[in-house]
């Protein structure tokens, strides 16, 4: 089984120097999404899951137009992280936004872990994983052991491939889950995906189950112009 993780296209975070809540895509974001979708043929994806936030929903549009997926599902639990401090940023200027994140990103690991954002991330991740496991179980994909690595039972009639269009924070939880890696409040910065880049996980059979390995990370080779490759 293969899982394709895609981050949304470039969002229009700032309009008239005001930070936007639930922004749509920039013109470049639409270009990135179109080029990303062109890499997949009609009905090459069994199921596509997508976040309902505008930037993800608009990234989905060319995938829908090209009929990439046989089935599309929108899930609330795929939304991006948004703690109370981040919510308070909406409507503020670019200078205020930069100042906020510079301060947050300069914390020690110890400070970050016990901060309001660090505690929020624990609940954020738990919600994603609980819902993810529920949906995977419906497809015949169940984690049966994690003593050494996450070992999955994958039914023969389960999907051959799954695509998930979401966000950097959401993707950090998904990657940490499938690859059985520690998840921290800053994990999304360790594995920061480019806009509309392709990250692929492929299951590998062992004697008594399967585990997922990272086959491809952050592939944006389909965006030829380096200036169009953004984070």
Question: Which ranges hold each PLM region?
Answer:
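Short active-site segment of divalent metal-dependent hydrolases/proteases
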Residues: 11, 170-171
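Phosphate-coordination/substrate-recognition cap region in phosphate-metabolizing enzymes
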Residues: 37-111
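Glycine-rich, phosphate-binding/catalytic loops in enzymes
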Residues: 21-23, 64-67, 91, 180-183
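Beta-strand elements within well-structured catalytic alpha/beta cores of enzymes
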Residues: 2-6, 49, 157-166, 170
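Hydrophobic, aromatic-enriched interface-forming segments
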Residues: 117-163, 171
């Amino acid at each position: 089984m293969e899982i394709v993780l895609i981050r949304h296209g470039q969002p229009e975070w700032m309009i008239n120097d005001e930070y936007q809540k639930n922004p749509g895509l920039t013109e470049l974001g639409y270009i990135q999404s179109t080029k990303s979708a062109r890499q997949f043929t009609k009905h090459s994806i069994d199921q596509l899951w997508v976040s309902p936030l505008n930037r993800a929903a608009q990234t989905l549009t060319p995938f829908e137009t090209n009929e990439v997926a046989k089935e599309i599902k929108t899930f609330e639990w795929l939304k991006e992280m948004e703690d109370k401090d981040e919510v308070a940023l909406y409507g503020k200027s670019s200078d205020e936004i930069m100042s906020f994140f510079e301060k947050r990103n300069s914390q020690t690991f110890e400070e970050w872990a016990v901060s309001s954002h660090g505690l929020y991330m624990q609940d954020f991740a738990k919600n994603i994983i609980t819902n993810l496991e529920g949906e995977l179980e419906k497809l015949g994909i169940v984690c049966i052991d994690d003593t050494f690595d996450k070992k999955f039972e994958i039914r023969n009639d389960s999907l051959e491939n799954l695509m998930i269009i979401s966000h950097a924070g959401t993707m950090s939880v998904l990657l940490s889950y499938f690859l059985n890696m520690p998840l921290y409040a800053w994990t999304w910065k360790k594995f920061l995906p480019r806009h509309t880049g392709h990250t692929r996980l492929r299951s590998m059979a062992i004697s008594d189950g399967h585990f997922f390995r990272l086959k491809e990370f952050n592939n944006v080779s389909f965006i030829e112009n380096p200036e169009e490759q953004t984070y």
